[in-house]
Amino acid sequence: MATENGAVELGIQNPSTDKAPKGPTGERPLAAGKDPGPPDPKKAPDPPTLKKDAKAPASEKGDGTLAQPSTSSQGPKGEGDRGGGPAEGSAGPPAALPQQTATPETSVKKPKAEQGASGSQDPGKPRVGKKAAEGQAAARRGSPAFLHSPSCPAIISSSEKLLAKKPPSEASELTFEGVPMTHSPTDPRPAKAEEGKNILAESQKEVGEKTPGQAGQAKMQGDTSRGIEFQAVPSEKSEVGQALCLTAREEDCFQILDDCPPPPAPFPHRMVELRTGNVSSEFSMNSKEALGGGKFGAVCTCMEKATGLKLAAKVIKKQTPKDKEMVLLEIEVMNQLNHRNLIQLYAAIETPHEIVLFMEYIEGGELFERIVDEDYHLTEVDTMVFVRQICDGILFMHKMRVLHLDLKPENILCVNTTGHLVKIIDFGLARRYNPNEKLKVNFGTPEFLSPEVVNYDQISDKTDMWSMGVITYMLLSGLSPFLGDDDTETLNNVLSGNWYFDEETFEAVSDEAKDFVSNLIVKDQRARMNAAQCLAHPWLNNLAEKAKRCNRRLKSQILLKKYLMKRRWKKNFIAVSAANRFKKISSSGALMALGV
């Protein structure tokens, strides 16, 4: 936790809040020379979740603009190819559709796939009116909703594979409602449209099964015998921070190392407000199962009585008005962070003497604690997977104008004890960041502080990247590059900026990994890589190829075990010293009360 005894906190200068950037929009041009023409009345409208729109509007503020939408590993492969095939949105083969043939020669030379994509125009059939054409265009817009929290990529439907090249911000602003079509007198609809009723019903049923009703998803309703017109309407509720799901590259990353996809989060992202209430009436607290603790409070497990949901409860004592102010800032920050690699906030309750934050329970424990296990075979590819996820989470934070400012191994947790999904936790020291305003802080854990924090200089998003470099160095070697015998020596080592790659421990580490670290642990913050540059670095790419030839066990496991043992000893020493001081104070007070 950021609030552990190893942290240093001297002063805080709060920045002003800033609006989150807007996401880009993407376009998908139509094939040259192809006129889609009116839809065939026998052909069912394409489900909105399987289509893309070439003119989707830009996202509202607060939408996530970072990563490409996901391609899910769930479901059969054929569904991912339905976007451009000749049988798009139809249950029957394209050969059964009426074709327009000018001459026998052109009819023979035309491929079947081209005939199916040409719109199947027939001179003998009446053309569909403008309103119906607009309805079909609206139906091609992508589904704006994700089925769950960004923390749960495993349950993303396979029907969302076609969104892989479309930024998530484009899919967050509109929903689609199926309403009965009203035909104008000048638009005679063929009576044979009713024959496509069964096909349309099956198409709707298939989409309904794969994308259950959620706010912002495509809604199917109306009498199918009269046809359906899809209209784009504003989303019922816009979330701050668009959900992110696994991209194809990241999904491939998990398939390399894990037997199963990452598990889902227990609840969707939500906007939390601090409210007064009785904790014991809603939650069963388990103080015996402690997860952590520090200066500001303790963390334990709990269970929501109404749902049986297991959560982590962070209990903060209200000793001064500033304590509540800090908690409100933490809630505000976490409301922005809708990402699979960032812990999710569930509820916040205030009592007369304390504030309790209920958060997602992460059962895997600290990342470092897991990889030092003797049964765990840590390779450089494992390290790449962990580092890339951390950089993904940092990138989302920075796009939402949030700085963590206390990134360290204790704040990187594994979702479970078998997979490779990790999450960043503890936003108690996080700050809103405006690049146009100066922000200075002088708190954090000395071992992972950047030189600008130690010097109380202006900080930026590159401040978190220094800490990312130190964590990566430790994952690869098991050594802490600036750790001294005490905090003063550690801070002096940070200010000097002198560090090196130990020849023995980095013997099995690739040059790409060393280059990655060398571009993060840089004294001049302007020369450091940002999170986006980290994700584009060669070391964090082409993992499938590297996994085939990189299975050598890193030496960092043994050294990390020694590091963790030393850290535990230091924590126990501080705890015992504090208890002894308290005992002496209590004894002195008792003697004074007796007049001794």
UniProtKB/Swiss-Prot annotation:
It catalyses: L-seryl-[myosin light chain] + ATP = O-phospho-L-seryl-[myosin light chain] + ADP + H(+); L-threonyl-[myosin light chain] + ATP = O-phospho-L-threonyl-[myosin light chain] + ADP + H(+). The modification N-acetylalanine is found at residue 2. One of its GO terms (cellular component) is synapse. GO terms for molecular function: ATP binding; calcium/calmodulin-dependent protein kinase activity; calmodulin binding; myosin light chain binding; myosin light chain kinase activity. The modification Phosphothreonine is found at residue 445. Residues 1-224 are annotated as: Disordered. Residues 285-540 form the Protein kinase domain. The modification Phosphoserine is found at residues 143, 149, 151. Residues 574-586 are annotated as: Calmodulin-binding. Residues 88-104 have a biased composition (Low complexity). ATP binds at residues 291-299, 314. Keywords: Acetylation, ATP-binding, Calmodulin-binding, Cardiomyopathy, Cytoplasm, Disease variant, Kinase, Nucleotide-binding, Phosphoprotein, Serine/threonine-protein kinase, Transferase. InterPro entries: Kinase-like_dom_sf, MLCK2_STKc, Prot_kinase_dom, Protein_kinase_ATP_BS, Ser/Thr_kinase_AS. Transmembrane segments: none annotated. Its EC number is 2.7.11.18. PROSITE patterns: PROTEIN_KINASE_ATP (PS00107), PROTEIN_KINASE_DOM (PS50011), PROTEIN_KINASE_ST (PS00108). Signal peptide: none annotated. It is an enzyme of class 2 (transferase). One of its GO terms (biological process) is cardiac muscle tissue morphogenesis. PANTHER family: SERINE/THREONINE-PROTEIN KINASE. May interact with centrin. It is linked to Cardiomyopathy, familial hypertrophic: A hereditary heart disorder characterized by ventricular hypertrophy, which is usually asymmetric and often involves the interventricular septum. The symptoms include dyspnea, syncope, collapse, palpitations, and chest pain. They can be readily provoked by exercise. The disorder has inter- and intrafamilial variability ranging from benign to malignant forms with high risk of cardiac failure and sudden cardiac death. Implicated in the level of global muscle contraction and cardiac function. Phosphorylates a specific serine in the N-terminus of a myosin light chain. Belongs to the protein kinase superfamily. CAMK Ser/Thr protein kinase family. This is Myosin light chain kinase 2, skeletal/cardiac muscle. It comes from Homo sapiens.
